[in-house]
Structures are given as structure tokens and as C-alpha cells.
Amino acid sequence: MDIYYFFSVWTPPVVWKSFGEGEVASGGSGSFNSEHSQVYAEFLTGFAKALEDKFGINVYGISGWNEPDQAMGGWDGCMWGNQQMADFTMDYLRPELNKQGLQDTKIIYGELPWWANAVTWVETSLKNNPNLADANIVAAGHGYSTVDANILPMTAAQEKGIHVWQTETCDDKTRDETWNDAMKWAKNYHDYLTKAQTNAVVWWAGARQCTSTGENLLQTDAWDFSNSYYRIDRYYSIGQFSRYIPVSYTHLRA
């Protein structure tokens, strides 16, 4: 079975961030300080290189941001500007990956929390920076709080032959383990594959203990070290896609 490893760094180290007046310096606040672009590119590349050299893990893709238009403080995060991300990708991260022999490692680009915003973000980046298409990127966004009408194609990326991924989704607000919920997610996956024409859809959390949210596919009996688990119905409906659509299959529109 082919396994594609990709990693997202939620925030750079605090010392490589800038903070507004009165803003508490933390992992969950602040913006990236572009003065540290080269050292951050080396930091990310070194991580990917270490996994390859020490464990034989080929990193398929790496992202230096997570939901870059939000730094909400509930978890680690960091604000990025659109042009700032494009400049870092083209001028620092891509050259550093290439320099260290990781030309095939893709840069997961975008990753905004709401899909429609990610579509706009990628479109703006490619319009203002045509050479970004040559940086071996994957255009990406998350699927939180996204209504069906906002599951749109990233046309600007697709026209340039850039693969499009929906890199994170779950129900982060309610808990439902029923088959009705499973069918809701089956439709959601189907819409991303057909309406948005994505090349991949990624669920947020595989196995964990949840009490008030629908973040998981396997419910464990403890948060950290568990002794048992059970499968939630959406495990089966989502699993149909990964089971019956092998890598390299092509979607043909009728």
C-alpha cells in the first residue's frame, strides 16, 4: 500500500514571529516575520531531510503554515500575508528543498480553514505570481464550516496543472455517530471530488477520544493511551472512497 506522508507546521518558533502592540507573544498568536525566511526554510527542509535520512520516509509534501488567515489562540497558529506566503515559497522554501535534494517534495500551499477563502487565496497568489506554478506546489484548503454551495473548484490552479487537495475536515462542533452522519460525509467527500474536482480529501483525526465533537473515525476509550476502540459509522462511508478509488485513478466527467 502506498502511503503519502505530508506535514503541516502550525507555527514557526515564536522568535521568528512578529507581534502587535499589546499582543501576548505565544505559539497561538502573531505573524511570520519575513526577516527569518531563510532560517525557517532551512528548518522545514531539515525536518523533511531528517525523516528521509534517519527513517527512510520520503516526505511527499510539507506546509509551513496552518490556517494562515487565522491566529485564534486556542491552538498554535501564525498569520501570513498572501504575497508573503508566495515570496517565501518561491524565493526560500523551494530553493532550499531543491538544494538539499528534495526536488520532488511538494509544498502544500494555502491551507485556509474555509474552502471558499482558500480558493480566493490561491487564485490571488497565482494571478500576482505566475511563477508560483513552477514551484511544485499543491493548492490546498480546509473544509470547515463549508456549505455545499462553497465547495468550488480551484480553477486558477487546475488550469496550470496544479493538483488540488482538501487537506483537513471534520465536524468540530457537534457529536453524531449515526448512519445519517455517515451519509452526510459521504456526500461531502463526493462533492469535493466532483464539484471541486480535488485530487485528495483528508480527514482531520483518525483515532482519538471525543465527547462533544465529530473529529474522529475511531473512538478510543482514553485521550492518550487507550486499550480499546470502536468504529464510528462515518469510518465506513468515508472508507469506501479510499478503498475503491486507488491512487492514479482519473475522474471522467460525463
Predicted regions and their residues:
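Substrate-binding cleft and catalytic face of glycoside hydrolase catalytic domains
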Residues: 1-123
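Structural recognition of the beta-strand scaffold that forms the well-ordered cores
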Residues: 4-8, 60-64, 106-109, 138-140, ...
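Noncatalytic carbohydrate-binding groove/subsite architecture in carbohydrate-active enzymes
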Residues: 49, 76-188
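Alpha-helix termination/capping residues and helix-transition junctions
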Residues: 55-56, 129-133, 194-195
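Flexible loop residues that form catalytic
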Residues: 67, 144, 206
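Aromatic/acidic polysaccharide-binding cleft in carbohydrate-active enzymes
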Residues: 166-239
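Glycine-rich active-site loop/lid that clamps phosphate-bearing ligands
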Residues: 243-249
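Conserved small/polar residues in nucleotide/adenosyl-binding loops
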Residues: 250-254
